[in-house]
Structure formats: C-alpha cells, structure tokens
Amino acid sequence: MKLPGADTFVSRLMQSHVATGLLSVTPVPLFLVRSILLRDNARENRNGGWQRLREASESARYRAVRGVVERYARDGFVLDVGCSQGILQEGLTYRRYLGVDNSEQAVAIAKAKSDLRTDFVCADGSDFVADQPPDAVVLSEVIYYLSDPVAAVQHHGRHLAPGGVLIISLYARTWPSRRLMRRLAARLELVECHLVRSDHLAWTVAVLRPSTQGVAGDEPAGSYPSRESEMTRNA
C-alpha cells in the first residue's frame, strides 16, 4: 500500500539502486538538492506524508540517532531541529525534549505527544534559541534544507550547555552530503562519526562540538571520512 505523500521525486530516487549509485559520484550543487527537497517537503506536509519515515528502511537510522542522543543527553535537555512530526522523540529517553519545525502541519501532529517534559514549536530552526541551553542539539536529515547549513550548525554550537554536543544525521551516499560533512568537520570538533546502513541506503551520524582551535581550512584531508566507523547494519 502506498503511504500518503510518499510518491515524491526524492522517495522514488532513493528506491533505485542505480540512482543512488549515480548520486554518490555526481557533484550536484547543494542549492539544487535543497530546491528539490524543499519542493518535496512541501508536498509531503500538504498531503499528510512522512509516514514513510516509519518504514523498516528508516528504523536503523532512528535507532542509531536515538542511541547517540541518549549516550550524551539521557538525563539532559534535547533540542530537535527539524523535528517534523516528532518521530525521533518516540522511544527517546530524556529529561526535557523540545522539537522545532517550520511546518505548521507537522508540528500540529507532533503536539499530540506534548507533556510536562515534551513540547513542539513551529519556528525557523536555523537561528532558533531555546529558553535554556540544550545538552544536545539534533539535526537529523534536516541540514540539506537550510540555506546556510554550516552557519546554522555553528549557531546552535554557540548556544549549547557546557559539555553539550551537536548530533547530525545526513544521507551518506551523495557527493553534496559528503562535502557538507567535510565542511562541518573543518569548522567544528568531530567527536565521533558512524555509518548506518539499511539495505542499499546509508547515513552518516556524527557528533560534533564547537572547536577550541579556531576555524580550520575548508575540507581538511583526513578528518572525514577516515574517522568514520560502521555502527549498524540492517540488511
């Protein structure tokens, strides 16, 4: 059965082994990727989509991200930037959780899960500032949508609690996403980086902190993906 909103360009692309293989070696500009994703995002929200994120092919990524979040902020405050309908929050252990998304439709659905420790707000996640410093800021499959993803990540790094971390998940097998990860690793401290596999798909899950060494040059050799290790396989 076809899920609502699932028939988008990106969802069809990701189902193709050939297409994902080509994407891994094709230098597609990030602005072009962003324009396609924003169009598909609007369609998914309009048609009540995103239920495809509950499919088995996505479960390995969610398990990996939740595991990393709980390792660093199990008893802390988690800020989930680009939370959509709050799927990451489901099953996550935390002291406080705040999800932020710019889609009114998605946030309206997510708010059904609000309680004393959990809330969702509709806002632009790029420059959002919470009412208290978070112990972990999560950007899971969202930085491609941002007009300046590196600046957004650095912004959230400046507002972390002492010892806080940035947890980023992005699709691993495209040229623009790998370049974006290298740019982030050049400007922030890369604490750990894992590859999460599910069928023919793969995601990078990275933990970063604000750098105490200043800003390095763009895309330093050896910082990524040489520090990447495989985390999960769900073939």
Residues of each region from the PLM?
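Conserved class I S-adenosyl-L-methionine
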Residues: 6-71, 75-84, 174-176
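Class I SAM-dependent methyltransferase SAM/SAH-binding core
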Residues: 85-126
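A short acidic, Gly/Pro-enriched loop at the edge of an enzyme's catalytic core
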Residues: 129-137
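A short SAM/SAH-binding and catalytic strip from SAM-dependent methyltransferases
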Residues: 136-148
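A short glycine-rich, Lys/Arg-flanked "PGG" loop and its adjoining helix->strand segment in the class I
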Residues: 152-162
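Conserved beta-strand signature within the Rossmann-like core of class I S-adenosyl-L-methionine
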Residues: 164-170
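Core SAM-dependent methyltransferase catalytic element
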Residues: 196-235
